[in-house]
Amino acid sequence: MTLDRDAASHVAEVLSEALPYIRRFVGKTLVIKYGGNAMESEELKTGFARDIVLMKAVGINPVVVHGGGPQIGDLLKRLSIESHFIDGMRVTDAATMDVVEMVLGGQVNKDIVNLINRHGGSAIGLTGKDAELIRARKLTVTRQTPEMTTPEIIDIGHVGEVVSVNTDLLNMLVKGDFIPVIAPIGVGANGESYNINADLVAGKVAEALKAEKLMLLTNIAGLMDKQGQVLTGLTTEQVNELIADGTIYGGMLPKIKCALDAVQGGVNSSHIIDGRVPNAVLLEIFTDSGVGTLITNRKRH
């Protein structure tokens, strides 16, 4: 197959633009939270797998953390197990936790591993229970109204938060040229399982590894101002101002807090990426314009 002159010129431009970024990130670790539309479209799934394999091929170390909420919901429905949510979190009783483990640790995790491996990678699937990769504890949720003298504690079952990450295991896999693919299930002090928000797991893994980047794939173009324009580069201070003035609100707040915590915890930058764009991960790290919002501790020049 031959390229015409214009196509060949475009390929050369793309490679030329990518080269300084490749040099900058060789040997660095990037943690990518994979979810949303990027997990549902066959074209986007294939593009994501190729992106991950290419990153590894040029010397970058990707670590993938995935979600799977819709798939969990589908199986619960088929099993006639009712789903309840409190503050956006799935109430996870024992029966629901069994389904979460089956779907995240089994079906979804192995599908992603298989896809990456089919495109030339060496992915290995993990849950937080493997070698106690993600130690967790029960998440305490409270609610208080003006009439209450003390906050009400709400039991949402086997929902957890990260206590620690086994970085020795992840570093061993990365050095062995494997691509870790992590399901967000944590293990408690007594061996119990916890369902943990995938964004939070990705953020804590990035902090623990002192990753170069935390990349959160979403179903939006990035953080937007009140006029609907994408904000391509922000400092943590600017993000806090946008939260204070109500520009960032609702369902985006937990995701943004995770991105902020990661940067403040030692990650060089966090990225809110439009996962609906083919090859979004490569476009964000290897091009000048990117496809989302970059958050750092310092201003861009």
From Swiss-Prot:
Catalytic activity entry: N-acetyl-L-glutamate + ATP = N-acetyl-L-glutamyl 5-phosphate + ADP
Species this chain originates from: Pseudomonas entomophila (strain L48)
HAMAP family: ArgB
Protein family per UniProt: Belongs to the acetylglutamate kinase family. ArgB subfamily.
GO MF term list: acetylglutamate kinase activity; ATP binding
Underlying gene: argB
Site (Transition state stabilizer): K33, K255
Identification of the protein by name: Acetylglutamate kinase
Chain's role: Catalyzes the ATP-dependent phosphorylation of N-acetyl-L-glutamate.
